[in-house]
Amino acid sequence: MGKTLTIQPVTRIEGHAKITIQLDDTGNVSDAQMNVLELRGFEPFCIGKPVEEMPRITTRICGVCPWSHHNASAKATDAVFGVEPASAGKKLRELCNSIAYMEEHILHFYFLGGADFVMGPDADYSVRHVIGIVGKLPDVARQVVKVRHMCAHMLEIA
């Protein structure tokens, strides 16, 4: 008889999820499923809204990468209207995308996944989180917050 492995909660992601892995009698994976436990449901907010509102609305889809959603919807809006942004506009989008890339990866690595690297994958859950990192490496934590703040400020003024 096979075995079922369940990982719940799945940590270090935006939101909550469960992974279920079915093993056959020989221990090989026969099935695997990932279940996201909450409905995002943002699509209905977009229906019937003016297309030029989409870059503002879609930034609320994800707290980790709002700029990526903004940029994708801005490009879609350009396509709807059949316009090509000016060279300066394209360069500004590329600059903002690069800054956001840094900020998003800092957020993901240090705040979502960093505890697994810093505290170790076998560390107790009571310390394997961002506050655990702050306690173990306060200087690194301060620098991470400072760089994220600088990225956010650059995006504000861009």
Regions found by a protein language model. Name each.
Residues 1-158:
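Catalytic cofactor-binding cores of redox enzymes
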